[in-house]
C-alpha cells in the first residue's frame, strides 16, 4: 500500500547547473547569471522557450514539478574560473546546499571547468 502512495506523488526536481540548465524566470536566486532568456537573443541561442530546455522536457514528460533551479551561467564545480579568477560565489560547491527539499536532483556541470582549464587536483 505504501509503495502505491509514494509512486502516486508528484516528484519535485531541483537543478544544479551551468548555462545549459538555466532559463530566465526559472532560476533561483534571480541574481544568477543567465544564458537563456524569455525574450530570445538570436545571436546568442536558438532556444525560443523554456519547453526546449533538456530539463524542462524531462520534468514535463514525467509529470514532475520544478522545486529549485540553482543554475549559473559560467559556473565551475571548483572555486577557480576563467583566467584563474575566484568563482567561489558561483561554484557548484557553494550552491549545492541551496536546492530546497527535492526528491530528485539533476547536476549538469564541468563544461566551464574544462573550457577554463581549471586544475583538477588530486583524488584523496
How would you label these PLM feature ranges?
Residues 6-8:
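Boundary at the C-terminal end of the N-terminal hydrophobic targeting segment
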Residues 12-14, 23-123:
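Conserved SGNH/GDSL esterase-like catalytic core that processes O-acyl groups on lipids
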Residues 16-18:
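Active-site flanking residues adjacent to catalytic metal/cofactor-binding acidic residues
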